[in-house]
């Protein structure tokens, strides 16, 4: 975590944090390791999501979000505590190739995500199509569905050949497509 580049260390956030705790996070040698500052950041983003959710759901609408993969990774990487957000569905961006992982990582990330939402929302595994071509395509789908995903979404693809493969896969598994 680099204050100058990756996360907000603006004057307003620092002042509000100081009002709560009596200290400026930048006074710490390693602010990125200060649990109070981390919690402040997690809570700040969660409050924004809660306000949006109240408005959207107050209008009777369904609310979903594309989030970073796996709640623990999202908390660490981008301060998204999305496992505690009041959404109806989550699309964790489980781009296994981006993280130099195989299709098995998709299953682990889905399992963690499903556990975090504990039945109160659907998990749709967000898959990066170029990462799951060839034999990895069905392996990735198995990993997602076998670990509790309600479905999958594709980022950057798939092409017509893989759409045919997807339909055949869903038919074999007995899944009924949503309208």
Language model features: what each stretch is:
Residues 16, 20, 116, 169:
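Residues that form generic nucleotide/phosphate-binding pockets
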Residues 87-105, 109-113, 119-179:
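Substrate-binding cleft of secreted/luminal carbohydrate-active enzymes
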